[in-house]
C-alpha cells in the first residue's frame, strides 16, 4: 500500500519490413536526455530496434501497454478460411506485435557490464497489447517459406473510432490496475510516441489526457503520503511524454527526450481537471451506423444496416441498465457539487462490463472480405458501426463512479428510501469534490447549515420522523413552507413546479442541490439523515435531473 506505480504506454506502427523475416525498424543505440531520471541510474546506452526496450530499462514500469492498429495485418493465404472475422484480425495483429518483441534483441551497457537478451523476456509478463481500429490503404509483406506474399489491405473506418476504442480499452485496463494496487503515493504514466504514425500520436495523447484527470480526481491516496504530509492529501498523478530522434540507419545514436511532463494532480493543484459530457438523449447512442463504410460494403443495404445498428445500440443500453437522464444528472452532480443527488444517481453498471460489451458489439459489426491470388492476398475490412461521443461520455462517468465507490470510506454508502446519513455525505464530499476547493467548501458549508438549522429547531421536531427542510428553516410557518436565502423568513408554499422558476434553479445549484423544498431531514440513531422528496409530484425528478446538468456540454 502506498507504493508508486508506473505504467508505460507505447504507440507503434509496423516494425516489420517482411514478416516474420526482416525488420523495418533499424537497430539504434538509444541514450537519454539529461532531464530523464532512471530508476537505477541511466545506462550508458540501450541498443535495440525500439525505444520500448530503452524506456523499460530506464523506468522499470510495473505495467506495459502497447498500442497498435489493425492496419499492420499480414496473413498467410493458406490459413484464410471463410469464417475469418475481425476478432481473428485482432488476434493476428497481437501475434505480429508479440513476435516482433520475441525476435528483437537488445543490449544494455551499464559501466563495464553488459546485458543481452530479447525484449519480450523483459516485458512479456507485464504486457498488454491493444489493437485499435485504423483506416486507410496499406501494402504489407510477409514470407511464407521461400515465397514473398503481398497483403493488400483496405480498411474503411472512422478516425474517431481509434480514439474512442483506445480510451475505453485504457479506462478498463487502468481501472484494473488501480483496483489491484489499492492506495498509492504516486501514479506515473509514461507515454512513448516515438514509433507512432499519422494520427496515432495525437489521438493517443488525447485519449490519455482525457482519461487521467478522472482517475486523478478520485483515486485513493497511499498511507505513506498521508503520514508524511501530516494531513490527508491526494495521490500525485503525472504524465510524462517521450519522443526519440529519428533513426535512419543501423547504428545511429538516437536520444530519447521527455517532451512534456504534466502533473495532472499534486495536492490540491490540477494540471488537468476532470471534464464530463452528458449523453445526447435519454437513451444514449452507443453505436451508430458508419454510413460511408456501410454504403461501400453493401450499397443496397445501408438503410437496413442502419436500423440494425440502431436496434443493437438500444439493446446494449437496456442490457447494461443505462439511463441517459440519470447519467446526465450524475455528471452534473460531479461537476456542480451536488452530493445527495450524486448518490441518488450513482450508476450501478460496471465499467468492465460496459467496455467488454460495447467493444464486442462494435467488432461484430466489422465485415472482413478477402480474395487470394497468386503470391498475394487482398483483405478488405469495413467498420459498419462507429463509436459516437455518447460512448466516451458514459465510459468516463462509469469510471468516476467505480473509483469513487472503491474508496474504503464509501464502500457501504448508497442511496435508498431510508436516506443517507450526514456523516456519509461528508465523507462523500471529501472524496468526490476534493479536486475542486470551491465545490468542497460549498458542499461542506451547505451540509453544515442543514445541521445547524436542525439543531436550532430540534425541540419542535420528533426524532425518527421526516421533516421538510423548509419547515425547519421557517419555524414560524406551517408544514410545506420555505424560506428564501437571506434575511427574516419570507415563506412561500413548496409547489410542485418550484424548479420552473429561474431563481429556484439557481438556488438548487448554489446550495449543492440541497434545496429547502426538495430535501427531507430526520434524526435517528444519533445521526442526521437526508433524502429527496420526489413524491411531491411525478415531474419533480425529471426537473431535478435537468437542472442538475446545467452548464455541461451534450455529446453529439
PLM region spans:
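Long, low-complexity, Lys/Arg-enriched
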Residues: 1-187, 203, 209-556
Amino acid at each position: 500500500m502506498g507504493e508508486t506505480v508506473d505504467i508505460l504506454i507505447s504507440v507503434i506502427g509496423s516494425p516489420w519490413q517482411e514478416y516474420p523475416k526482416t525488420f523495418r525498424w533499424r537497430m539504434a543505440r538509444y541514450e537519454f536526455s539529461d532531464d530523464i531520471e532512471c530508476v537505477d541510474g541511466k545506462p550508458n546506452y540501450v541498443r535495440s530496434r525500439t525505444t520500448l526496450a530503452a524506456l523499460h530499462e530506464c523506468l522499470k514500469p510495473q505495467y506495459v501497454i502497447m498500442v497498435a492498429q489493425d492496419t499492420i495485418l499480414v496473413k498467410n493465404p493458406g490459413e484464410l478460411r471463410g469464417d475469418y472475422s475481425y476478432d481473428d484480425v485482432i488476434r493476428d495483429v497481437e501475434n505480429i506485435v508479440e513476435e516482433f518483441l520475441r525476435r528483437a534483441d537488445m543490449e544494455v551497457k551499464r559501466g563495464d557490464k553488459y546485458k543481452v537478451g530479447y525484449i519480450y523476456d523483459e516485458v512479456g509478463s507485464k504486457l498488454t497489447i491493444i489493437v485499435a481500429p485504423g483506416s486507410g490503404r496499406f501494402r504489407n509483406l510477409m514470407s511464407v517459406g521461400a515465397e514473398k506474399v503481398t497483403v493488400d489491405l483496405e480498411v474503411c473506418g472512422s478516425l474517431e473510432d481509434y480514439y474512442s476504442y483506445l480510451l475505453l480499452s485504457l479506462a478498463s485496463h487502468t481501472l484494473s490496475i488501480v483496483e489491484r494496487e489499492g492506495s498509492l503515493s504516486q501514479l506515473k504514466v509514461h507515454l512513448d510516441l516515438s514509433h507512432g504514425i499519422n494520427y496515432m500520436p495525437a489521438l493517443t495523447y488525447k485519449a490519455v489526457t482525457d482519461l487521467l484527470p478522472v482517475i486523478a480526481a478520485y483515486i485513493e491516496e497511499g498511507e505513506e503520503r498521508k503520514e508524511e504530509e501530516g494531513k490527508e492529501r491526494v495521490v500525485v498523478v503525472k504524465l510524462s511524454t517521450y519522443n526519440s530522434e529519428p533513426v535512419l540507419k543501423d547504428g545511429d545514436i538516437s536520444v530519447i527526450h521527455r517532451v512534456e511532463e504534466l502533473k495532472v494532480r499534486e495536492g490540491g493543484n490540477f494540471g488537468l481537471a476532470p471534464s464530463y459530457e452528458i449523453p445526447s438523449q435519454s437513451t444514449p447512442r452507443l453505436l451508430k451506423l458508419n454510413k460511408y463504410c456501410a454504403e461501400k460494403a453493401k450499397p443496397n443495404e445501408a438503410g437496413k444496416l442502419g436500423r440494425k445498428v440502431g436496434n443493437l445500440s438500444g439493446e446494449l443500453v437496456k442490457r447494461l441498465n443505462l439511463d441517459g437522464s440519470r447519467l446526465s444528472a450524475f455528471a452534473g452532480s460531479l461537476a456542480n457539487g451536488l452530493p445527495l443527488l450524486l448518490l441518488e444517481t450513482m450508476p450501478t453498471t460496471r465499467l468492465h462490463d460496459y467496455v467488454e460489451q460495447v467493444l464486442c458489439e462494435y467488432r461484430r459489426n466489422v465485415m472482413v472480405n478477402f480474395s487470394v491470388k497468386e503470391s498475394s492476398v487482398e483483405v478488405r475490412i469495413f467498420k459498419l458501426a462507429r463509436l459516437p461521443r455518447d460512448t466516451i461520455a458514459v465510459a468516463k462517468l462509469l469510471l468516476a463512479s467505480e473509483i469513487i465507490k472503491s474508496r474504503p470510506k464509501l464502500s457501504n454508502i448508497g442511496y435508498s428510501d431510508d436516506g443517507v446519513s450526514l456523516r456519509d455525505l461528508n465523507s462523500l464530499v471529501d472524496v468526490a469534490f476534493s479536486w475542486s476547493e470551491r465545490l468542497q467548501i460549498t458542499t461542506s458549508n451547505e451540509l453544515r447549515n442543514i445541521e445547524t438549522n436542525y439543531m436550532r429547531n430540534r425541540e419542535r421536531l420528533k426524532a425518527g420522523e421526516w421533516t421538510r427542510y423548509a419547515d425547519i428553516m421557517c419555524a414560524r410557518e406551517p408544514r410545506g413552507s420555505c424560506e428564501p436565502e437571506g434575511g427574516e423568513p419570507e415563506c412561500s408554499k413548496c409547489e410542485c413546479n418550484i424548479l420552473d422558476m429561474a431563481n429556484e434553479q439557481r438556488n438548487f445549484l448554489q446550495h449543492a442541490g440541497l434545496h429547502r423544498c426538495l430535501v427531507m431531514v430526520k434524526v435517528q440513531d444519533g445521526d442526521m439523515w437526508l433524502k429527496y422528496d420526489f413524491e411531491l409530484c411525478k415531474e419533480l425528478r425529471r426537473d431535478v435531473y435537468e437542472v442538475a446538468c446545467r452548464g455541461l456540454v451534450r455529446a453529439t
